[in-house]
């Protein structure tokens, strides 16, 4: 429909067109904030988008305390973002993409492993720690789809 073409500067404007009304919509969640937005802007975006959304997908983080707090306070069901199996080198690279705070927390939590950059890491510990409060996980396949799929099958995480 050509009537909805326009200059959109945020996803909320796209959602408000009604074009996606027949789809389930997930919105971004930032348990540790964002390097690109202030906390108040993140809260404003969450409050504005929540009435149109069905669930929240969080950014990848290793901070289970921040995730637990976020899940408890979220206005919608939360799909917690975790990194699938990947080398430490790959995880450190992606941690940098989601913000300095995440990178520092990740490095602190994994300081003993930081020199073994080729070892494959999995999110099993994060999943086990959150499993009693979280029903849904979103797996970021930073280490590749094949490796992630094999891990999901091995751990029997498929439903």
Model-inferred region functions:
Residues 49-52, 80, 137:
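Conserved, mostly hydrophobic/aromatic
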Residues 2-9, 55-70:
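Active-site glycine- and acidic-residue-rich loops that bind
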Residues 81-132:
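Catalytic-face loop-and-helix region of soluble metabolic enzyme cores
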Residues 15-21, 47-50, 71-74, 128-132:
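Acidic (Asp/Glu)-rich catalytic clusters
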């Amino acid at each position: 429909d050509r009537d909805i073409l326009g200059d959109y500067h945020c996803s909320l404007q796209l959602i408000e067109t009604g074009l996606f009304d027949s789809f389930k919509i997930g919105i971004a969640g930032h348990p540790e904030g964002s390097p690109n937005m202030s906390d108040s802007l993140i809260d404003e975006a969450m409050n504005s988008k929540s009435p149109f959304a069905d669930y929240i997908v969080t950014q990848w983080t290793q901070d289970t305390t921040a995730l637990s707090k976020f899940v408890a306070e979220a206005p919608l069901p939360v799909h917690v973002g975790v990194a699938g199996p990947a080398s430490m080198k790959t995880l450190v690279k992606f941690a940098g993409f989601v913000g300095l705070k995440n990178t520092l927390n990740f490095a602190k939590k994994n300081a003993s492993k930081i020199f073994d950059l080729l070892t494959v890491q999995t999110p099993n510990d994060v999943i086990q720690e959150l499993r009693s409060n979280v029903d849904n996980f979103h797996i970021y396949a930073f280490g590749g789809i094949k490796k992630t799929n094999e891990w999901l099958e091995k751990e029997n995480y498929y439903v």
